[in-house]
């Protein structure tokens, strides 16, 4: 879009040459205009658990080492918080590494994960809470019995895991006794309500050591620094309590051509490689580069919890 034209009011005198005033003295230069600078020029608010200033400056946090463990991994988040993007990235990386794992899509309202990745199981009636609970129960036992890691997509409004935890308050200890570890990735945007799945599960006492809070930069307005967009989230009591007990905050970078990748139904690495998918043309060279840079940024941001992956 072209820059808007601003008409000069007729009663405004044109600016004089700044080099000399009428008296021959140098004129005082006008204050420089920086868009957004005057909106919030105060000092940064000190927030416990948010000791860095911007996503690009945050060092990858180090999580507990789970390299020797099989894992039960849940990605949990409300709609439009980047949950499916995150779990797709995780699944693709595991598949490229040749990792044997089980995958399940239990989001009752969004089955995108199972549409992008092959061999993802899904309950016959994902919207039926009773059948979904039985299905998850049997799926977990199947993974434990066969010693295979499991990757599960749970919707933010899904109550299946919550009801299972209510029935089995010792679920974490029971799974750990089988030589497995439970890993939770909560995806959140700038809305405080996005913390509700985290607050609910933490309130039930479901607090695995390997818990990450994934702050999705794509949910912030373009041009708004992430530390500003997520300020209320970063100082919310639910976030601070989870971080205080050991949860790891991780920034998920924005993928600018996400829609173009989705239109073509492409895996991220295929998009970067110039595959066509269900589209008529591949991504252009700029967007392919953006996807590749995003993949590299994801690897860097999640490096501290690399052993939490399948």
Please provide the spans of the model-predicted regions.
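P-loop NTPase switch/communication element
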Residues: 109-125
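Conserved catalytic-core segment of NTP-binding enzymes
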Residues: 160-263
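Hydrophobic positions on the alpha1 helix immediately C-terminal to the Walker A/P-loop
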Residues: 85-86
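Extreme N-terminal, non-catalytic leader segments
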Residues: 2-73
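The conserved Walker
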Residues: 79
